[in-house]
């Protein structure tokens, strides 16, 4: 809707009056219990729409490190070099291991 320079104030006041009348008409029809139910419904919708932050599970991180520890222990039992490894990111399902100057890249199976 375009507002012309000469009539912008009168149109705005008319729109304001119309919106106030509409709000008054709607609220006058509703009873207190209707308003309470409406507020309760809006609160429920709001709480459902808010995305809960995902909790970082300590068990998930621990199991990831343990599985890589098993890989390193197996390599030591089979005569491999003892590994001093660092887990970069468990979500990648891989681990970067470093021992001295040697570097190893393990893929989780």
From Swiss-Prot:
Bilayer-crossing regions: 26-48
Gene Ontology CC annotations of this record: membrane
UniProtKB keywords: Membrane, Transmembrane, Transmembrane helix
Protein name: Putative uncharacterized protein YOR225W
Annotated localization: Membrane
Chief location of this protein within or outside the cell: membrane
Miscellaneous comment in the UniProt entry for this protein: Partially overlaps ISU2.
